[in-house]
Regions:
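Short alpha-helical DNA-recognition segment
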Residues: 16-39, 54
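Interfacial/linker helices and their anchor residues that mediate assembly or domain coupling
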Residues: 70-102
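DNA major-groove recognition helix of helix-turn-helix
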Residues: 26, 41, 51, 67-70
Length: 102
């Protein structure tokens, strides 16, 4: 299973959506929504970038989440996306302190 396929399935389950509901909410045709989402989750087909963007909106995750290889990186992307602008600045400052000159 590809990283993209795995992340789509994880985010869908986390959101509590069926494959059909996710496909419909992302703008797929009613007759093929479930089948297409199933194929994406199995890694048999790769969704176009514009569909990945729509999935990210429906599932409330950043599009980059779908391409994160490591699970902790994927989780970090979700958490970072939920921060406000000021919180992001604070986090980046703290990360710079922690990393120093690494």
């Amino acid at each position: 299973m590809s990283v993209l396929a795995k992340r789509i399935k994880q985010a869908r389950i986390r959101a509590g959506l069926s494959q059909e509901r996710l496909g419909l909410d992302a703008g797929l045709d009613e007759m093929s929504a479930s089948t297409r989402m199933n194929r994406y989750e199995l890694g048999k087909r790769v969704p176009a970038p514009d569909l990945v963007e729509r999935l990210s909106v429906v599932l409330s995750v950043p599009a980059a989440y779908f391409y994160a290889v490591e699970d902790d990186e994927a989780e970090l992307l979700i958490k970072f996306s939920k921060l406000g602008a000021d919180e992001r600045v604070q986090l980046m400052e703290r990360l710079n302190e922690l990393l120093g000159s690494r």
